[in-house]
């Protein structure tokens, strides 16, 4: 019987982890003897203090400082360079109000985040930045130890909270996402997917697992994807055949291409939720979910008939244990079928509350909606972390200038601002969009399920596409130092990349949106309100066109009139839906006439529909993007309009304006070719965008950056402490010392550099 020799038990850490822990303790002791421990301890404490303050703004205390800060007198700038004169002092920046307004969680829910933060503060030996040079097995061990600590020792997560207070559960999970996406995914697999699927697809008989899920005695995994099938879940080949003589299901992998692939928690799981084709007698009832034991929960030995392998090194998320699984005629009790939407009785008869197989299939995959909603939040966090690092770097990094004068902070260069600031505005749009999805999910009802499905698919695809592109550009804006793993931008790029295909390939998800747009086309054109569209409602195209005055606006500032830009994007969406629907219909009619004799009658409808869809696929994707952009714009506009705090509203209004101008610019080709805007106005648009960017003062940008993320990303090129205090430093040397400190605190493979040899033995931070 195969056995995991290196699998850590719940009672003791692995040998490699013990060795690593010993090395860390030895290094800490040596650093203490040499006076270096003050650096690590102080930084670690400061980072966790910042994290605590950020994640719980309701209890945040105003920091007393002798520095001049944005929260007191505006940003202080004593730079004696060729940069513009220091800007006038600003009003008190509403950090607390803005942070609270950006949060989707209530004060009570934020306490769950605070609990996670405090737990991390209590264990700096586990939650530290010195893990980038660990071996892969050490990374897996460390990730598992971190999860065990948060779940078993600190009780930060439970199935009961997930079931009865889902918003509180997601609040706690969000704190983990800020620290490490792989730790977040591993914890989500145990609770959101393993326990969450039992809750959503199972019945009373499956609640017996919950206590052991909380204690991690039963680690779980979630197996849909196969080597040959990812997006096409209907096509998976793993079978679950009912055996009447033994009242069991036989789980079987019929071919190597049917092996389950990318299965998270594969190194530690005892149980696996296996999606397979349910076969009763000679009839295939489609994809259902089964609880399949894969390891002995006491010995951790792999069970007979189960084969588990390692998918090995990935592009990112290296500290997440993804594996592959095969099943050789493994028998499980009939009760292990998650039977909420379909069951096999003791008499061996299949029954389901759904008469429509497609509706049943959709219900079976309901947990994917939760995954897509979670990815929207995680993707937005990834953008926020990279923005904070890049903005902090840009204020401190100095390059070029007038002869015999100090060099300029790179934030003063137009190219830097015109790249970063529009992405900052986009972040706030995405933050509110993710929050909107959060509220839809935790308050979901059968009536809102369709809207939730469409928005989670569309937002996940759009946000991850845009954010991956933005993070790559932000890396470039940090120059060569941004390439260093010490600053974690490259790690963020690698970890975030999977979000574009994780929980649904983005191209496929956009087509999910397209299906609903076409299905609701008749309602839109007859002026009926459609539950798929959460916007303000729609009008007949002629009416919309008459309201768009893009060719007749007096000047570019009129572009920021909400009546104009809301109608502009509604019109664009209407036109695109009408165009693609008409083209799809015409192609379908042509195909029906052309192959009337060549294709059997019983196959003709499906074949023609498939081919017609493929011929308009690119246009369908463009239409889905138009829908998502319109929804995000509506959400951002409404959040700014409804903001109760005057100063916060003014700050967000400027971000909304920059987002609107960027969105119009992105779609300007469409507006020009469809006579919705004139070439002259497009030129004015570029100037207006530059004007809005120029109006954003340093103190305002630092104040906004303060709300992005806590000081937990461990990027030495960013002065997070300065951002938190609103201080523009005139001395960038701590940033460069930070690079050296981080390098020396990680494993040195060559050379003779030490804290002493480079003069850092007495540095104070």
Regions found by a protein language model. Name each.
Residues 2-765:
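Flavin-dependent oxidoreductase catalytic core characteristic
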């Amino acid at each position: 019987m195969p056995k995991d020799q290196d699998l850590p038990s719940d009672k003791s850490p692995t040998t490699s982890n013990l060795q690593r822990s010993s090395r860390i303790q030895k290094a800490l002791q040596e650093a203490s003897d040499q006076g270096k421990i003050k650096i690590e301890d102080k930084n670690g404490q400061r980072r966790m203090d910042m994290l605590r303050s950020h994640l719980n703004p309701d209890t945040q205390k105003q920091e007393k400082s002798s520095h001049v800060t944005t929260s007191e007198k505006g940003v202080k700038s004593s730079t004696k360079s060729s940069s513009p004169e220091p800007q006038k002092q600003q009003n008190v920046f509403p950090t607390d109000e803005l942070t609270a307004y950006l949060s989707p969680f209530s004060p009570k829910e934020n306490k769950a985040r605070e609990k996670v933060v405090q737990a991390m503060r209590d264990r700096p030996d586990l939650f530290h930045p010195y893990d980038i040079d660990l071996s892969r097995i050490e990374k897996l061990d460390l990730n598992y130890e971190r999860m065990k600590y948060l779940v078993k020792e600190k009780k930060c997560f439970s199935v009961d909270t997930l079931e009865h207070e889902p918003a509180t559960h997601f609040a706690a999970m969000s704190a983990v996402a800020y620290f490490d996406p792989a730790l977040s995914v591993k914890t989500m697999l145990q609770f959101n997917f393993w326990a969450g699927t039992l809750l959503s697809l199972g019945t009373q008989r499956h609640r017996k697992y919950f206590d052991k899920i909380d204690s991690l005695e039963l680690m779980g995994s979630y197996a849909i994807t196969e080597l040959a099938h990812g997006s096409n879940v209907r096509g998976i080949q793993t079978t679950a055949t009912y055996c009447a003589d033994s009242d069991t299901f036989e789980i079987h992998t019929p071919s190597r291409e049917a092996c389950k692939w990318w299965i998270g928690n594969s190194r530690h799981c005892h149980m696996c939720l296996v999606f397979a084709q349910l076969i009763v007698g000679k009839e295939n009832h489609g994809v259902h979910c089964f609880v399949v034991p894969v390891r002995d929960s006491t010995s951790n030995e792999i069970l007979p008939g189960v084969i588990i392998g390692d998918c090995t090194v990935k592009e990112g998320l290296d500290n997440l244990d993804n594996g592959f699984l095969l099943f050789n005629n493994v028998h499980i009790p009939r009760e292990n079928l998650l039977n909420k939407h379909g069951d096999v009785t003791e008499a061996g008869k299949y029954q389901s509350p759904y008469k429509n197989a497609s509706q049943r299939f959709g219900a079976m995959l309901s947990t994917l909606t939760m995954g897509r909603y979670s990815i929207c939040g995680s993707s937005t966090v990834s953008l926020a972390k990279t923005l904070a690092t890049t903005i902090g770097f840009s204020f401190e990094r100095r390059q070029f200038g007038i002869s015999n004068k100090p060099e300029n902070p790179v934030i003063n260069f137009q190219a830097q601002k015109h790249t970063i600031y529009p992405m900052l505005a986009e972040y706030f749009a995405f933050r509110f969009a993710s929050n909107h999805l959060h509220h839809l999910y935790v308050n979901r009802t059968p009536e809102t399920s369709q809207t939730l499905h469409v928005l989670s698919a569309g937002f996940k695809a759009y946000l991850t596409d845009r954010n991956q592109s933005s993070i790559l550009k932000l890396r470039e804006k940090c120059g060569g130092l941004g390439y260093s793993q010490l600053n974690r931008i490259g790690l963020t790029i690698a970890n975030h990349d999977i979000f574009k295909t994780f929980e649904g390939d983005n191209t496929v998800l956009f087509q999910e949106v397209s299906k609903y747009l076409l299905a609701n086309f008749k309602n839109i054109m007859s002026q009926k309100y459609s539950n798929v569209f959460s916007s303000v409602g729609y009008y007949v195209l002629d009416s919309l066109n008459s309201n768009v005055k893009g060719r007749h606006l007096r000047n570019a500032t009129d572009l920021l009139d909400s009546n104009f830009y809301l109608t502009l994007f509604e019109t664009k969406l209407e036109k695109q839906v009408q165009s693609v629907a008409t083209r799809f219909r015409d192609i379908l009619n042509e195909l029906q006439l052309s192959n009337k004799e060549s294709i059997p009658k019983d196959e003709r409808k499906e074949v023609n529909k498939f081919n017609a869809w493929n011929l308009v696929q690119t246009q369908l994707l463009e239409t889905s993007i138009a829908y998502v952009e319109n929804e995000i714009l509506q959400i951002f506009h409404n959040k700014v309009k409804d903001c109760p705090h005057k100063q916060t509203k003014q700050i967000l209004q400027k971000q909304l304006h920059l987002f609107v101008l960027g969105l119009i610019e992105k779609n300007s080709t469409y507006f020009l070719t469809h006579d919705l805007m004139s070439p002259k106005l497009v030129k004015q648009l570029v100037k207006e965008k530059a004007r809005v960017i120029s109006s954003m003062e340093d103190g305002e940008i630092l104040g906004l950056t303060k709300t992005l993320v806590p000081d937990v990303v461990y990027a030495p090129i960013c002065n997070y402490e300065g951002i938190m205090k609103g201080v523009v430093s005139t001395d960038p040397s701590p940033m460069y010392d930070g690079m050296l400190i981080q390098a020396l605190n990680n494993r040195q493979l060559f050379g003779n550099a030490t804290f002493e040899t480079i003069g850092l033995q007495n540095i104070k931070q």
